[in-house]
Amino acid sequence: MFDSTAKVEIFGCDGSYFCLAGEGQGTEGVYLSTNPRGFYDAPVSTIWKSSAFQIGGSYRGKRINQREIVFGVEILGDSSEEWEENDSRWRKAWDYEIDPWDPAGSQTRMRITTERSGPRDLLLQLSENPDFASDKDPRLTGHGTVPMTAIAGQPMWFQEDELDGWKLESGTSGAGTVTISNPTDQPMLIKWIVTAPGTWTLPDFSWVGRKYERVPGGKYPTRTVKLPALSASEGGATVDLDPMKLMVRDVNNTNLLGRMGGRFFLHKIPPYTPETLLPVSVTGAAPGAGVVLRQPRHWSRPWGLE
């Protein structure tokens, strides 16, 4: 029985809010039109090559592209003034870029929530100017259709990061475990955050196994990486496997890789990795020292794939 619908919400770059579909739809005078496109699987193109006399071709990889979504909204109003106000509010919720004058500026956020999968978000910017479609003056009819085209530079739908951590309760050295998992369909680029002072040793295991049965294994099943000794003035360190970020940096964003003797982190967490305990340890620290593991949750679709 089909007894629930997806809820589609917009959190504007100006702080505004609109519910476009689902419970509460149209309360702000705007609701989702029909035939939205680009919401489903993330855009992927595969790369193939063939030699001069090869029959067929050989797979060489894939490229994940930015996501373009095309949709329309119906803007309503009970009077000419109300329609203009709703139309203006909707337009101000969007921009082509993050406001360069606002230190807290942000992109527009689209959220789709389903009962099974919960909320998943995209960060969006306009890729071209919004259009307008109406046979008559909307100030007379109280209704107009606005086609929209927007781009998500990060094409994966995302949820709040999963957090786990460990804290040194006493003494200057100790060891413990943190729990890691990746229930999504995408490789996970984790982030470690450690306190200072201290010298931390963090896991960087390789993984093997079928989906839902991944375990540390393969070439480096017990590999660890020792971070450089951190002084209190450095304020701690972040290890970020996102290739667009500094891999190891202190709280002042100073690159620490030059102090690591040529060692760095190698391994992503594969899709559908079950909960697994990972070892962490520290020396030369103080009671209360701790480590936090941030686990991003990225999905290629707005629902499903668990």
Where are these regions (language model features)?
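Polar/acidic, low-complexity leader/linker segments enriched in S/T/G and N/D
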Residues: M1-W48
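Short polybasic amphipathic segments
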Residues: D3-F11, T108-M110, T201-W207, L246-V248
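Short, solvent-exposed beta-alpha or beta-beta edge segments that form flexible loop/patches at the rim
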Residues: S33-V70, D131-K136
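Oligomerization/assembly interface segments of phage tail-like spikes and tubes
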Residues: S50, Q54-E84, T141-M156, L278
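Long, hydrophobic/aromatic-enriched structural stretches that serve as scaffold segments
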Residues: K62-L122
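Solvent-exposed loop and beta-edge segments used for protein-protein assembly and interaction
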Residues: R63-R67, D102-A104, L140-G144, T184-Q186, ...
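Short beta-strand and beta-hairpin "edge-sheet" elements
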Residues: A104-W157, H298
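Intrinsically disordered, low-complexity segments enriched in serine, threonine, and glycine
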Residues: E160-E306
